[in-house]
Amino acid sequence: MANGYFTPGIEGFLTGEIDANTAVLRAAFVRGYTFSAAHKFVSEVTGAGGVINGVSAGLAVTVTGGTIDAADTTATTTASAVDHGILLYQSSAVGGGADVAASAQRVIAYYDTGTGLPIQPGSGATPITWDNGTNKIIKVG
């Protein structure tokens, strides 16, 4: 298990293909996935054995001081299962709007190690609590 950023996700921020200020970012519970920094799309995560079991609403994102943060949220899980990580991804086109197909949804980061991780959700609304310290969701530098 390992937390990590997806290399194409970081490249997406640098090239403007991912925009935390205008696009819709979501968090999803994923189980059965072994992190690969090379993955670019949600469809690659699920194609590598990751099973999505709950997706948050669009995150209320803030970008300041070299960090990306968001309000804590919930994701409704559809079945009880164990050992879920959190997948952060851009669900819309770069300009925002409706969700695009999983084959076009850009993955950004994956978290399965840390306080409260991996998550052991039951059925129903399961909280996602972001770091309130200096690291937030993503910290540059």
Where are the regions that the model predicts?
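Small cysteine-rich, disulfide-bonded extracellular modules of the LU/uPAR three-finger superfamily
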Residues: 1-84, 91-141
